Every structure is written in structure tokens, then in C-alpha cells.
């Protein structure tokens, strides 16, 4: 091999080495797989009867029906504290509520859209709060300010409340079934 060919080969190798991608950062994942997580104690469904209300009860946007308290009984909960993503250590969790079918009302993404088998009502949605203080639970995302629930033992009750909220004036509400389903995930982060 002549000197020119060797020089070209060395030059090409040097150029290839110089074009390597530089890293701007690293993503490090941490977590834990647990053997004990809370489960719904009485099957995987909690039924909540919100009641029957006249559209005239909702005079303006934001009017509410009476609250309906309900409990999600949990069993097999962890009894030892664990470290959360914020660095704190406790026996607490958040609920991740994921809407189904109708999603959210659109006018207010914090209200569950109602559905019905025949003709669903319009102009109302369902709000879900922590019962102890009325802190609203976010839908399809985590709350900006965490709404946590403490684990008090292997059996723990999650006390919530729900109610209808109008998204339009009374005259624009249409009568019909006002049902909804929300999937619940217990979030230990």
C-alpha cells in the first residue's frame, strides 16, 4: 500500500471517529416491584347511586346535586412504609381515575361525562372528591397537588364523595340517564 492510500485511510478513520454522537444527558429509572398491593375487598366494582334530580335544580353553571358519600374497601394493603418519588417515606397512595366511554364533559375536563343506554342526559358531569376535605380527584392524570390516602392497616377504607355538576344553564340541560364508569388504579408513587 502506498503512502497516499495509507494517509487517506487514516484520514477517513479520524473523520469517522470525530462524528460520533455526543450525549446530552442520561435517563436513570428507579422503582420497585412489590409483593403486596391493596386490592378491592368486595370484587372489583363499587356501585354508587347518585340519585334522580330535576334539571331545574341546576340553575347556573357549576350548580351541584347533593353529595353521595361512598367507600372503596381495600384489603391486602402493604403494612410497611415505602419511599415515594418526592423522597418522602409513608404508607400512602393516590388514586388514578381513568374515564371510559364518554371521557370527560369537554366543557370541564375534571368532570366525568355521563352516558346512558338509551338517551343520556346532557349538560351535567360527575365530580369525585376525597370525602374528608372535598379535594377533587383529577381525571386521566395525577392531581397537580397530590390528593393522598393513608393506609391504616391491611384493610383500609378510601372514603370518597360524588355528585352531579352542571356545565350549562338549566334550560340547556336535557333529561336522560346520567351514568358513568371510571377505572381506578392505586398509585404508590
Predicted regions: what is each one?
Residues 2-6, 21-189:
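Mature extracellular/passenger domains of Gram-negative fimbrial/pilin and adhesin proteins
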Amino acid at each position: 500500500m502506498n503512502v497516499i492510500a495509507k494517509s487517506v485511510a487514516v484520514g477517513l478513520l479520524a473523520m469517522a471517529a470525530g462524528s460520533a454522537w455526543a450525549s446530552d444527558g442520561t435517563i436513570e429509572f428507579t422503582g420497585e416491584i412489590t409483593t403486596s398491593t391493596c386490592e378491592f375487598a368486595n370484587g372489583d366494582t363499587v356501585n354508587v347511586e347518585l340519585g334522580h334530580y330535576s334539571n331545574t335544580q341546576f340553575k347556573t353553571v357549576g350548580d351541584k346535586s347533593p353529595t353521595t358519600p361512598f367507600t372503596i374497601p381495600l384489603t391486602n394493603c402493604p403494612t410497611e412504609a415505602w419511599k415515594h418519588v418526592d423522597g418522602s417515606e409513608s404508607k400512602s397512595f393516590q388514586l388514578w381515575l381513568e374515564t371510559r366511554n364518554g371521557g370527560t364533559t369537554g366543557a370541564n375536563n375534571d368532570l366525568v361525562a355521563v352516558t346512558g343506554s338509551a338517551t343520556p342526559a346532557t349538560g351535567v358531569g360527575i365530580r369525585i372528591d376525597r370525602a374528608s376535605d372535598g379535594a377533587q380527584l383529577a381525571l386521566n392524570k395525577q392531581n397537580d397537588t397530590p390528593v393522598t390516602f393513608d393506609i391504616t392497616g391491611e384493610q383500609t377504607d378510601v372514603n370518597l364523595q360524588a355528585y352531579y355538576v352542571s356545565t350549562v344553564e338549566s334550560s340547556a340541560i336535557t333529561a336522560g340517564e346520567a351514568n358513568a364508569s371510571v377505572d381506578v388504579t392505586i398509585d404508590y408513587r
